[in-house]
Regions:
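C-terminal transmembrane helical hairpin of 12-TM major facilitator-type secondary transporters
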Residues: 283-330
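Conserved MFS/SLC helix-loop-helix module at the cytosolic interface between two early adjacent transmembrane helices
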Residues: 68-105
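Helix-to-loop junctions at the C-terminal end of transmembrane segments
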Residues: 69-81, 271-284, 368
Length: 406
């Protein structure tokens, strides 16, 4: 179902490559949007008359907005079409960007941040199904490019900020990009939603063959959803607080602190392609364990020995081993565990990730003050959550190898 105002009836369908391009541009800007507040934290503290706690509250509202709308967005996408869903996501992102500049306190900024969370929900619910439907022969690769486009934008943004400095130039430019995209999407015929793909014969056969050793919903299902939270928590908290950690704890310059996110994003971009290849040859649980242990170890090293070199190496490690596709590996395991309920379990897994974007910054507001020690404590929390994830991972891996679930 399409709203009549959005699309002309006799309009020819757009090429699928054009639709994919629209999706990637949308995520390119959204990827930059989610780190804007942390990248301009000092400037926003003056504009909104607040401190680091206030900045954390604004950041946390992204997660709350995502939590509130994530289930609604999925229903809306199936009911009213991928195009209309993406349009709502794009408009929400524009509202966020404009709102950042006109806000004069953290409460106005927090309301605007809710719209970015809404953009997250509607972009995901419209874009991922669209790519899966338009590219049925290679959905995983096309969806991986979403992460790649976000990583690319997060690589470029800190460099642009270092060169331009002014939020009054960068943020309106991002809004204009989305505005132009919105115009193109509004007059493009996306075609009808694809039908739900039925289980293949091989999937049905696999279910029958492993019927005596099925994963437990209460143990394996819940455990994987917990990993959906912990895996997201590690890289999200790092991406939000690494720049200010570098300034307050290490004593680095603002320019250096912002480049940490560039290293993180470049590494993440590289990892997207390498991890997608590795996971075809190595058991996914082995990939999860190795990646998570390396990420947790580097975080711990940075907490114990915070230096510019260690911070840069940690950015590279977190980008590659925590943000470059490991979350998607967990989702793949969960989908293979419960092939008859892929949609539902994906929703639970995504909801756990959305919880990260709210819980992490909110908890940080109770830890942060104006001292460097409080920032160290935030990263100690990140390490603790990483260790918790590894413990859950080991339990699930032992069960997987013992009962040969996959």
């Amino acid at each position: 179902m399409e709203f009549p105002i959005m699309c002309k009836k006799n309009q020819p369908k757009a090429k699928r490559s054009v639709l994919a391009f629209y999706v990637y541009i949308n995520y390119f800007v959204w990827g930059s949007s989610i780190i804007l507040v942390s990248q301009f934290h000092s400037w926003f503290m003056e504009l909104w008359h607040t401190d680091l706690k206030g900045i954390s509250i604004v950041i946390s509202m992204l997660g709350l907005g995502h939590l509130i709308t994530v289930l609604l967005a999925g229903w809306f996408s199936d009911k009213f079409g991928r195009k209309n869903t993406i349009i709502i996501g794009t408009i929400s992102n524009i509202i966020f960007l404009i709102g950042l500049l006109i806000s004069r306190n953290i409460w106005m900024a927090s309301i605007c941040s809710l719209f970015l969370g809404n953009a997250n929900s509607f972009n995901d619910s419209g874009s991922y199904p669209l790519l899966t439907e338009k590219f049925p022969e290679k959905p995983a690769s096309m969806n991986a490019l979403v992460k790649a486009s976000m990583s690319l934008s997060q690589t470029i943004l800190p460099l642009v900020i270092a060169a331009v400095h002014s939020a009054y130039i960068i943020i309106p430019a991002m809004a204009v990009m989305l505005g132009l995209l919105l115009l193109k999407v509004s007059v493009t015929n996306f075609g009808k939603n694809g039908s739900i793909v039925k289980e293949t014969v091989s999937e049905q056969k696999e279910i029958l063959e492993t019927s005596t050793n099925k994963p437990s919903v209460l143990i394996d299902g819940v455990g994987m959803v917990i990993l959906g939270f912990t895996l997201s928590f590690i890289f999200y908290m790092y991406s939000q607080y690494a720049p200010v950690f570098a300034e307050k704890v290490i004593g680095s310059t603002p320019v250096f602190s912002k480049t940490l996110i560039s290293w993180y994003a470049i590494s993440s971009l590289i990892s997207v392609f390498i991890t997608s290849t590795v996971v075809r040859k190595v058991h996914p649980f082995k990939v999860l364990l190795v990646y998570s242990i390396v990420a947790a170890a580097m975080l711990a090293v940075m907490v114990v020995h915070p230096t510019p070199t260690i911070a840069r190496l940690t950015s590279i490690a977190i980008g590659f081993f925590a943000a470059g596709g490991i979350w998607q590996v967990g989702l793949t395991i969960l989908s293979r565990y419960f092939p008859r309920e892929k949609g539902r379990v994906t929703g639970y897994y995504s909801f756990a990730a959305a919880l990260t974007y709210f819980v992490g910054p909110i908890v940080s507001t109770f830890i942060l003050d104006d001292t460097a020690a409080s920032l160290v404590h935030v990263f100690v929390l990140d390490v603790a959550v990483s260790v918790l994830g590894i413990i859950v991972m080991i339990i699930l891996a032992v069960r997987c190898f013992k009962y040969k679930f996959i």
